């Protein structure tokens, strides 16, 4: 409903009535006069180029402008600079490109430092003694002594007759049972970890994109078309080259223990491998138990008479004989001349070696070997998948200063931000400007930088031990045992006739005999001559600086000096750097809207001069958060970020559990029997004594000293390698290692180039300033624009530094079961004869904990004169080095 005011019935100037509703649009009136030119506001900051949105529909026509007076077209004051808009959401994640070419394998790393020699294990307990052999048969009685002599008084006891000759040796007794195997020694500690190998070579870079197209000319703006349907997705771009793996992140906490793996099927035994090179000579192992009695070998040719055996046990005393007549004690005869030494008997041929004995007890663990060469570096792993969501955008950055408006040019690439110019002088305050429009919400800031790496986590608790594995299959039966221990020597038999000399026997094996008694100390040598005078000594070391003396007492305070003249004013100081910008204060409360003023008469003034630009209006209050805008086009891929600092060395993992014992090796071949020692010369028979009555049983004589050992024979050739034993069941799978840390977030790429600025349209007629309308409802977001074609893949960035070595994985669970022992190998051929001995006794020196040399004990050679020389067994040979 319209209301009218009749001015004819009122006096005075006409008063404005209330504003009526909007009428229908009338025909366009004549062009009005231009209004006064407004102040030119500062140019706004160029905004980020947005994505091309769909063309909007045409809005409804606005109300017609009120006819104004004839004036020049005015120019409204430019509004204040709007706040920066929100950054668009991240585009959809592109498809991952195929894996790049495989990098070449890295060069093999250097050998690690040799590990510390492990301590020698404790020797096993000795086996039980063998059963005693059967007693030898008593030899035949000696010939009776000559009778005669004067009859002595009754009841007297005759002198003891000469001892009968020794009977023949008895047959050897049965071998005693084998002693139990000694307990295995403790394993040596693990060697030091080798240094990591060199990093592999970087992969080949990807193929570069095509050449850049020529710059197109700027076309004339065409008319706006209707909104087209979204086009189909463009063809998928070529995948980019595989990037180098990023540096390793901070070590993550150890993951939970994995489930116990299923037991794998038993593997098939492998074929016999090629014969390996002879290993280094190890330390002598512990004595094995006595083996079972072997099958009797073929009887060899009669050998020469052996050395005199140990004295047998005396027989039980016989019944006392009848007392004989007392004989006359004859004078002792002079000792006869020494007999000539008989020809040495030729040693008989060695018998065939018996069947190999059963495997002996497990020897002590050998000295820990040097760690082998490090294998070649493994292939580079594929880059891990990105773990974790994209972080929220960081706070908004500070807006830069507004730039001046330039001429319209071709859209160029966005340049790097320039350095800030010096601060200009403060201008004169301009006239107060109009209230600025409400500012738009500020743009979201760039994402914050990557946080510092967290503290290294504590190592997790050790997992519980797994269940014991299933019992392994029963091993194959062992081979036949070796020859049993020889029985005790029987009584000495009568001397046999000298046999026919046999053919020369093969050189026997060198066996170390027992240590002979130490010789007596020789007489002291003559005194030496006086030596020449010694050379002049070196100058003594420089003396140390003495301690500083005690601090002296402070002297008395002096009198105060006269006051000096007052100084003049100094030169003015240099202009300081401008201080940092203060914090923006909180926005003040919005003022209350004043009542609308009366509409004044339309003025018709002359065009005034352009006034000074007014100060920038205060920033409006923050508006409501808008709905998310349409998804922008995907920006260019950012350059590769700088390589992160290499991570710190992770804590060493726990020591792994002890591995399963290896299978027993095939038993060694028994060496050839050494030659018997040379028979001693037979003494002359003494004069037969008188036949006396049997005397009391004499005490057992002391055993004679052992003769010198024969020269050691050359060792036999090593036997052929037996077939490898069946491989043991596969051990249970250890728990999975901890998951690696996620890589650092990528650096945000640079913004796309700014679009060309459109031509400024002509200013319309200035209408009356209406009342401020209510805030309209927020429009719905437009449809999403079509993604542009994917650009060519950029070249690969430089390879990042190699990350530190990861920590050791968690130890595996139970040990695998031990496989059965392989069958013994065939006996090897007899070795060639060895060189003659050097006159040294081979002595084994026990281990010493604190020895002056790294060998900590070993073997010594002792010469007949009592001196000792250390014998070092050179690896891979039987040479002996004397020290």
UniProtKB/Swiss-Prot annotation:
This is Collagen, type I, alpha 1b. Residues 13-33, 821-836 have a biased composition (Pro residues). Belongs to the fibrillar collagen family. The lineage of its organism: Eukaryota, Metazoa, Chordata, Craniata, Vertebrata. Residues 34-57, 113-122, 129-140, 195-205, 214-223, 230-248, 310-326, 390-402, 425-444, 512-542, 574-584, 717-726, 742-756, 792-812 have a biased composition (Low complexity). InterPro entries: Collagen, Collagen_Structural_Proteins. It comes from the Eukaryota. It holds the Pfam family Collagen.
């Amino acid at each position: 409903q319209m209301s009218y005011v009749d001015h004819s019935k009122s006096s005075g100037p006409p008063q404005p009535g209330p504003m009526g509703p909007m009428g229908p649009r009338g025909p366009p009136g004549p062009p009005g006069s231009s209004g006064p030119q407004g102040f030119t506001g500062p140019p706004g900051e160029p905004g980020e180029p947005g994505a091309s949105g769909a063309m909007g529909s045409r809005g409804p026509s606005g109300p017609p402008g009120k006819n104004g007076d004839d004036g020049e077209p005015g120019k409204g004051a430019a509004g204040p600079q709007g706040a920066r808009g929100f950054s668009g959401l991240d585009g959809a994640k592109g498809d991952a490109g195929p894996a790049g070419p495989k990098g070449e394998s890295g060069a093999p790393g250097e050998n690690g430092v040799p590990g510390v020699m492990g301590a020698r294990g404790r020797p096993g307990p000795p086996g039980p003694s063998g059963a005693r052999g059967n007693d030898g048969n008593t030899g035949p009685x000696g010939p009776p002594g000559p009778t005669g002599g004067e009859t002595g008084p009754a009841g007297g006891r005759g002198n003891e007759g000469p001892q009968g000759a020794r009977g023949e040796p008895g047959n050897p007794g049965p071998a005693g049972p084998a002693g139990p195997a000694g307990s295995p020694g403790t394993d040596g500690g693990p060697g030091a970890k080798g240094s990591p190998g060199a990093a592999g070579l970087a992969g080949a870079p990807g193929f570069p994109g095509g050449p850049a197209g020529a710059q197109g000319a700027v076309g004339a703006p065409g008319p706006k078309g209707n909104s087209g349907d979204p086009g189909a997705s463009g063809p998928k771009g070529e995948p980019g080259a595989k990037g180098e793996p990023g540096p390793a992140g901070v070590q993550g906490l150890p993951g939970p223990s994995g489930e116990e793996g299923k037991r794998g099927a038993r593997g098939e035994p492998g074929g016999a491998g090629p014969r390996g090179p002879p290993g280094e000579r190890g330390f002598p192992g512990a004595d094995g138990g006595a083996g079972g009695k072997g099958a009797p070998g073929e009887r060899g040719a009669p050998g020469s008479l052996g050395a005199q055996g140990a004295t047998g046990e005396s027989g039980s005393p016989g019944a006392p004989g009848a007392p004989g007549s007392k004989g006359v004690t004859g004078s002792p005869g002079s000792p006869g001349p020494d007999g000539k030494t008989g020809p040495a008997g030729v040693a008989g041929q060695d018998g065939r070696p018996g069947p190999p004995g059963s495997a002996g007890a497990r020897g002590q663990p050998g000295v820990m070997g040097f760690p082998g060469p490090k294998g070649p570096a493994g292939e580079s792993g594929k880059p891990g998948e990105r773990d974790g969501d994209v972080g929220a955008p960081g706070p908004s950055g500070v807006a830069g200063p507004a730039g001046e408006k330039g001429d319209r040019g071709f859209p160029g690439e966005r340049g790097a931000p320039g350095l800030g110019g010096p601060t200009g002088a403060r201008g004169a305050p301009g006239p107060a400007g109009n209230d600025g429009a409400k500012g738009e919400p500020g743009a979201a800031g760039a994402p914050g930088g990557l946080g510092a790496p967290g503290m290294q986590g504590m190592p997790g608790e050790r997992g519980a031990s797994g269940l014991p594995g299933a019992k392994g299959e029963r091993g194959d039966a062992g081979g036949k045992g070796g020859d049993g221990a020889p029985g005790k020597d029987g009584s000495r038999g009568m001397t046999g006739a000298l046999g026919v000399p046999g053919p020369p026997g093969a050189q026997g094996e060198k066996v170390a005999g027992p240590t002979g008694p130490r010789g007596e100390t020789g007489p002291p040598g003559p005194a030496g001559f006086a030596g020449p005078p010694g050379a002049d000594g070196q100058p003594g070391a420089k003396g140390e600086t003495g301690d500083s003396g005690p601090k002296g007492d402070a002297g008395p305070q002096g009198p105060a000096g006269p006051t000096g003249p007052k100084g003049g004013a100094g030169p003015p100081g240099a202009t300081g750097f401008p201080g940092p910008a203060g914090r923006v204060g909180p926005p003040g409360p919005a003022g209350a809207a004043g009542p609308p003023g009366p509409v004044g008469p339309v003025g018709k003034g002359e065009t005034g001069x352009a006034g000074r630009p007014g100060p920038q209006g205060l920033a409006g209050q923050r508006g409501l958060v808008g709905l998310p805008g349409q998804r922008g086009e995907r920006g260019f891929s950012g350059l590769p970020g700088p390589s992160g600092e290499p991570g710190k060395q992770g804590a060493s993992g726990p020591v792994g559990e002890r591995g399963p014992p290896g299978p027993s090796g095939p038993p060694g071949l028994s060496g050839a029997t050494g030659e018997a020692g040379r028979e001693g010369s037979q003494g002359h028979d003494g004069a037969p004594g008188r036949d006396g009555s049997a005397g009391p049983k004499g005490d057992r004589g002391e055993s004679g000293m052992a003769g010198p050992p024969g020269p050691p024979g050359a060792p036999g050739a090593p036997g052929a390698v037996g077939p490898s034993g069946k491989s043991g069941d596969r051990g249970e799978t250890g728990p999975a290692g901890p998951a690696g840390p996620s890589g650092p977030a990528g650096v945000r790429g640079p913004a796309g180039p700014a679009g060309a600025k459109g031509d400024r349209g002509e200013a319309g007629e200035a209408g009356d300033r209406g009342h401020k309308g209510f805030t309209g409802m927020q429009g719905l977001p437009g449809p999403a624009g079509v993604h542009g074609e994917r650009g060519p893949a950029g070249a690969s960035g430089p390879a990042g530094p190699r990350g530190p070595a990861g920590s050791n994985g968690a130890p595996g669970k139970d040990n695998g079961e031990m496989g059965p022992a392989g069958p013994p190998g065939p006996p090897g051929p007899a070795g060639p004869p060895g060189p003659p001995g050097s006159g040294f006794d081979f002595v084994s020196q026990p281990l010493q904990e604190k020895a002056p040399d790294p060998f900590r004990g070993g073997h010594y050679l002792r010469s007949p004169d009592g001196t000792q020389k250390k014998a070092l067994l050179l690896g891979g040979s039987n040479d002996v080095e004397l020290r």
